[in-house]
A protein has these predicted regions:
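Short, solvent-exposed turn/loop segments enriched in Gly/Ser/Thr/Pro and often Arg
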Residues: 16, 156, 202
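A generic structural-conservation signal
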Residues: 38, 152, 177, 198-199
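Long hydrophobic alpha-helical segments typical of transmembrane helices together
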Residues: 185-209
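Conserved beta-strand edge residues that scaffold enzyme active sites
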Residues: 43-44, 182, 203
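Hydrophobic positions within alpha-helical membrane elements
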Residues: 65-66, 163, 197
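GST-like fold's C-terminal all-alpha helical module
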Residues: 106-193
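GST-like domain detector, emphasizing the conserved glutathione-binding G-site
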Residues: 1-134, 140
Length: 209
């Protein structure tokens, strides 16, 4: 996304280089082809302005003129509403609620174990790997019916799942044969131009594109 960062813009994103949820936000920005300045921040080298803007001391922060957002889900929905093309959420309320619920499940069932994967407790790491592998395998059959997660169209749910799938090798997780539909789904995500555009230099090294 270096090319995007070099253009003048009123919108600024502060992100680290490795977190999956920050990557998900960058995917949305790339899908929308937003003119955005992306500042990659190291945890021990935060600019003073970020400390002033974000009361939760987290890095992920979007600034759009006078608006400051620091929750990933709010950022993604704001971007989808602010830049409606291409749409990443359904128009009708029922399907929109369904997709929000799916994102909630992704965060609860998958993202919730990621902190354990970075820990020093070997038992906790092994347990987190098993939970993530089992939960991913459980949703694999859904991709036999539709090209994207419970949908014919690419949505914010897929933007959240793509970073996880990209990091499986980094996490030391190998899907079983029953997870083949999920791996094929991941390959479709990785082939999208916006996905390759969204990668930080560190993320590019996770495995060959």
């Amino acid at each position: 996304m270096a090319g995007m960062a070099n253009r003048r813009s009123l919108m600024v994103l502060y992100s680290d280089k490795v977190s999956p949820i920050g990557h998900a936000v960058r995917i949305v920005l790339a899908e929308k082809d937003v003119n955005v300045e992306i500042n990659y921040i190291e945890d021990n080298d935060r600019p003073e302005i970020l400390n002033d803007l974000n009361p939760y001391n987290s890095i992920l922060t979007l600034i759009d003129r006078d608006l400051v957002l620091y929750d990933a889900q709010i950022i993604m929905e704001y971007l989808d509403e602010r830049f409606p093309h291409p749409p990443l959420m359904p128009v009708d309320p029922v399907n929109r609620a369904s997709k929000r619920q799916l994102r909630y499940r992704v965060m609860t069932d998958l993202y919730s174990v990621l902190d354990e994967l970075d820990g020093d407790n070997e038992i906790a790491v092994a347990n987190a790997k098993k939970i993530l592998r089992d939960n991913l395998t459980a949703i694999a059959p859904a991709f036999v019916q539709t090209p994207y997660f419970m949908s014919e169209d690419y949505t914010l749910v897929d933007c959240c799942l793509a970073p996880l799938m990209w990091r499986l090798t980094q996490y030391g997780i190998k899907l079983p044969m029953s997870g083949k539909p999920l791996q094929q789904y991941a390959d479709r995500l990785f082939e999208r131009k916006a996905f390759s555009t969204s990668l930080s230099a560190v993320e590019e090294e996770y495995h060959a594109i």
